[in-house]
Structures are given as C-alpha cells and as structure tokens.
Amino acid sequence: MMAEQNMQEFIEVLSSKAAVPGGGGACAYVAAAGMALGAMVANLTTGKKKYAQYQEEIEELLSKAEQLSKELMTYMDKDAESFEPLSKAYGLPKDTKEQQEYKEEVMEKALKEASLTPVALMEKILDALKILERLSVVGSRLAIS
C-alpha cells in the first residue's frame, strides 16, 4: 500500500518509470498533507480564550479534517488500482481487426473506470478546501501562514 510507504520511498517510486504512483497518487498525498495542516491549525486553536466563541465549531472542523486526511490517503492506492486495467489495456495487441475492435472496447471501458477515481478525489479535495476556508476565518492567526 502506497500510503504505508515513507515519504522518501514514495518520492523515489513517483520519479521512476513505474506506471504508478502517478499524478493522482501524488495529488492525494499532497491533499492529505494539506488537510493535516488544517487539522494542525484546529489543534493549535483549540482551547485558546481568544477563539472560545468558535470552540465547538473548531472541534467539529478538527474531526472532519482528521477524517478527511485519512480518506484522502486511501486515494493514493485507489488511483493506482483504477489505473491498472487501463495500463493493461494499452498493452493489448492490435494486429488484426478483431484485436483492434477488442482493444478499443476494453480501452473505452478502462478509460471510463479510470476517470472515476480522479473525479471522486477532486470532490474530496473540494470538501477539504471548504474546511480550510472556514479554518482561515476561525483558526488562530498565529497558526495560519
């Protein structure tokens, strides 16, 4: 599982000739890190008198940020898994008309399936941005940089 690799291992594989991880896995990793930074802002704000009026909301945002960061990490593997059939489809023979038709059919299905994960990831990132936007308003000014 990619999410269990250390950062150096992930970066090394990302920079290699390997088909995965690719842009989707890297995007998921960066989004999870961004959401973790949002959780850090919430943690640094929790319990501060200056932000007492937002305490309940900050705790809720913290919970959402921590959960979403974990969910985003799962997309590192989901992206690789959804790309695998497409990668295999690229390698199908196309010497005969039947092979070409079969490859075209498989490619169409694989492309559609492979696109679902990045779209779902983008939706999760939009959720993350909403949390970060709110934290920029109610979070500690010292933690937001």
Model regions and ranges:
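Amphipathic, well-ordered alpha-helical segments in soluble domains
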Residues: 6, 10, 33-40, 75, ...
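Amphipathic alpha-helix face/heptad-repeat signature
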Residues: 29-33, 61, 68-75, 110, ...
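Amphipathic alpha-helical interface segments
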Residues: 79, 83-145
